[in-house]
Design a protein with these regions (language model features):
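Short cysteine-rich clusters marking metal-coordination/redox-active sites
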Residues: 33-36, 53
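Alpha-helix N-cap/helix-start motif
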Residues: 45-46, 63, 110
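Cys/His-coordinated zinc-finger cores
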Residues: 51-66
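Canonical RING-type zinc finger of E3 ubiquitin-protein ligases
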Residues: 39-48
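Extended, low-complexity intrinsically disordered regions enriched in proline/Ser/Thr/acidic residues
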Residues: 2-31, 66-163
Length: 163
């Protein structure tokens, strides 16, 4: 949908989105920045699906919108598409994908935060070796999935397990 063809958001819808966002940042997994682990997540990368502190949000913005699309939790109006993405993901699932091959709970030292973020998202240094799943609930398991022969680039990974 093009920008020009979007209908204006109603006040009720904007208020509902704001309430949902405030509730999401209160969840234990979203209270800390997905990247540096600091408190006060007032920003989010809606396409990655993670909540961020102000410092890390600036680094995300500097990577460009082809990597990360940042919005304020408090100041911006969120579209239904953006809300759907941030609600499906959250920090736990986002880090299950982007930090799959990194020690759990890793927090980079202050002087290395920018290089850590760029390695994490631009270079995909610790990411799963599978495409980003359409349904992030597949990441709710504790073990990273290896790519399968049926995984196509750009498509969600398929399971080889029997039902």
């Amino acid at each position: 949908m093009s920008y020009a063809s979007r209908k204006p958001q109603s006040r009720a819808e904007a208020d509902a989105h704001a309430r949902t966002l405030r509730a999401l940042v209160k969840l234990p997994e979203n209270k800390h920045c997905a990247d540096c682990k600091r408190n006060d997540t007032r920003w989010a990368s809606w396409n990655i699906g993670c909540f961020l502190c102000i410092r890390c949000s600036g680094i995300h913005r500097s990577m460009g919108t082809h990597i990360s699309r940042v919005k304020s939790i408090d100041l911006d109006i969120w579209t239904p598409e953006q809300m759907n993405s941030i609600q499906k993901w959250g920090n736990k699932r986002a880090n299950a994908y982007w930090e799959a091959h990194l020690k759990a709970g890793h927090a980079p030292p202050d002087h290395k935060v920018e290089s850590f973020i760029r390695s994490k998202y631009e270079l995909r240094r610790w990411a799963r070796q599978t495409p980003i799943p359409e349904d992030p609930s597949v990441l709710d398991t504790d073990t990273p999935q290896a790519p399968t022969a049926t995984t196509q680039p750009g498509a969600p990974p398929t399971s080889t397990r029997s039902a």
